Amino acid sequence: MAPQLLLCLILTFLWSLPEAESNVFLKSKVANRFLQRTKRANSLYEEFRSGNIERECIEERCSKEEAREVFEDDEKTETFWNVYVDGDQCSSNPCHYRGTCKDGIGSYTCTCLSGYEGKNCERVLYKSCRVDNGNCWHFCKPVQNDIQCSCAEGYLLGEDGHSCVAGGNFSCGRNIKTRNKREASLPDFVQSQNAILLKKSDNPSPDIRIVNGMDCKLGECPWQAVLVDEKEDAFCGGTILSPIYVLTAAHCINQTKMISVVVGEINISRKNPGRLLSVDKIYVHQKFVPPKKGYEFYEKFDLVSYDYDIAILQMKTPIQFSENVVPACLPTADFANQVLMKQDFGIVSGFGRIFEKGPQSKTLKVLKVPYVDRHTCMLSSESPITPTMFCAGYDTLPRDACQGDSGGPHITAYRDTHFITGIVSWGEGCAQTGKYGVYTKVSKFILWIKRIMRQKLPSTESSTGRL
């Protein structure tokens, strides 16, 4: 019985062997999912073959040095290695506004185009008023995380939300008769057209006027106003702000008993009573101190009388605008300080005196003068430069235009619109090297000017007021 049982067990074992084989051994296709054979590197002829990135790093794992041997270039190796180690971080195009992505190990770097910043170039810089004025043509105001553009009076905001479109033929600050190429050729010489502080010249010469200035052609300085006395002699300048308001210097007000205004003229040699505009009311800044009695305009200087040196004339009848008579635009304080006064140049114009105590120039002159750094301005002056003043001009020329157009305009152009930035006020000496023209800083008085211009007073007898 026992031999029969043993035989049965042996037969059963032999019968089960094929089944066991099918359970232990997998088909090659299935087995390759789990087991992969790597081709052996550095075979007998490996070192004699040129580098191949597929053989070195794709078919087998390679080191950075091995990759370097293939590329033979550090930059190409670095680019490959950053992707090889952990994939391409730039594949999702993380850099906005056409920024350029550079992959790194576990990171990436965006190189932004001009005007954009942030890790992903996601911040548009011109949405800050501090950068290119927010791309606004006139005024820029920050609003939460954005900016808001607006325009000077008489202009409409363009559909793009940045540009300003003139709403009429005689909108402020428009130089209708453009200077074309003459603008670029305006002389870069300082002629501080003021000479309130004067020393007598040893050799007065008829050539000393707005030195190297150019004639301002008809319509090129349309905001220029001239203050004349009862004899129609010009004694100060002014700037047209609106049909009934003209800006000037406060120290001009006490120079004559009667003030009339002339506009639209480039030659004042001919008397013409019909062109005179009567002044209805005069507003002098409340902090301006008039010169003392017995004050001689050319020989004495009282600094107190030149701080807050600003006044506004109100006309009895409106000024008629034309292509030769246009007001200058009034800026906001921020726009003037942060944009206009950071330009290279301003433009001054006037009928400057020919020489010290000499007659006025009969033709209107214009020139551009650079803004002067405040610290340099203060160091150059023996008299204090107050916060209501700024300097413009050069320090190297030995001549300037003594006793010119006090009260006249200092204009700064921005995107083809001309804004009032200063009033010709005073200067130390005449033709002195290292000295600059000093101007009333209009940005300090924007609210004061607007408060006066909002008034609509009935016509009254000519009078002088203080506000």
Swiss-Prot record:
InterPro entries in UniProt: Coagulation_fac-like_Gla_dom (IPR017857), EGF-like_Ca-bd_dom (IPR001881), EGF-like_dom (IPR000742), EGF-type_Asp/Asn_hydroxyl_site (IPR000152), EGF_Ca-bd_CS (IPR018097), GLA-like_dom_SF (IPR035972), GLA_domain (IPR000294), Pept_S1A_FX (IPR012224)
Pro-sequence residue ranges: 21-40, 182-209
Keyword field contains Repressor: no
Glycosylation sites (chain numbering): 92, 254
Catalytic activity, reaction form: Selective cleavage of Arg-|-Thr and then Arg-|-Ile bonds in prothrombin to form thrombin
Keywords of the record: Blood coagulation cascade activating toxin, Calcium, Cleavage on pair of basic residues, Disulfide bond, EGF-like domain, Gamma-carboxyglutamic acid, Glycoprotein, Hemostasis impairing toxin, Hydrolase, Protease, Prothrombin activator, Repeat, Secreted, Serine protease, Signal, Toxin
Alphabetized Gene3D superfamilies for the sequence: Coagulation Factor IX, Laminin, Trypsin-like serine proteases
Chain ranges of the EGF-like domain: 86-122, 129-164
Active-site residues (renumbered): 251, 309, 406
PROSITE patterns: ASX_HYDROXYL (PS00010), EGF_1 (PS00022), EGF_2 (PS01186), EGF_3 (PS50026), EGF_CA (PS01187), GLA_1 (PS00011), GLA_2 (PS50998), TRYPSIN_DOM (PS50240)
GO biological process: blood coagulation; induction of blood coagulation in another organism; proteolysis; venom-mediated blood coagulation
MF terms in GO: calcium ion binding; peptidase activator activity; serine-type endopeptidase activity; toxin activity
Signal sequence interval, chain numbering: 1-20
CDD domains: EGF_CA, Tryp_SPc
Regulation: Activated by calcium and negatively charged phospholipids.
Oligomer and partners: Heterodimer of a light and a heavy chains; disulfide-linked. Is associated with oscutarin-C non-catalytic subunit (AC Q58L91) in a non-covalent manner.
Protein name from the UniProt record: Venom prothrombin activator oscutarin-C catalytic subunit
Origin species: Oxyuranus scutellatus (Coastal taipan)
Organism phylogeny: Eukaryota, Metazoa, Chordata, Craniata, Vertebrata
